[in-house]
Amino acid sequence: MPSVKIKENEPFDVALRRFKRACEKAGILADVRARECYEKPTTVRKREAAAAVKRHAKKVQRESKKFTRLY
């Protein structure tokens, strides 16, 4: 669990923002959303495979764009 020590004369909003950033870095909210309801192992594998395919297509498109000559 992330913790934030409030500095002297530090506004509450700033401390809250630092806490939110620490929680996001730790991945707490993503973990809570993932565990919110049960997901079958086959569904997990299918979703992760689809994400890998999407990442690969994005990478290939970025690499092919590098070599396009515009002259």
Swiss-Prot record:
InterPro entries: Ribosomal_bS21, Ribosomal_bS21_CS, Ribosomal_bS21_sf. Signal peptide: none annotated. One of its GO terms (molecular function) is structural constituent of ribosome. Keywords: Ribonucleoprotein, Ribosomal protein. GO terms for biological process: translation. It comes from the Bacteria. It holds the Pfam family Ribosomal_S21. Gene3D superfamilies: Ribosomal protein S8. One of its GO terms (cellular component) is ribonucleoprotein complex. The keyword Ribosomal protein applies. HAMAP family: Ribosomal_bS21 (MF_00358). Belongs to the bacterial ribosomal protein bS21 family. This is Small ribosomal subunit protein bS21. The gene is rpsU.
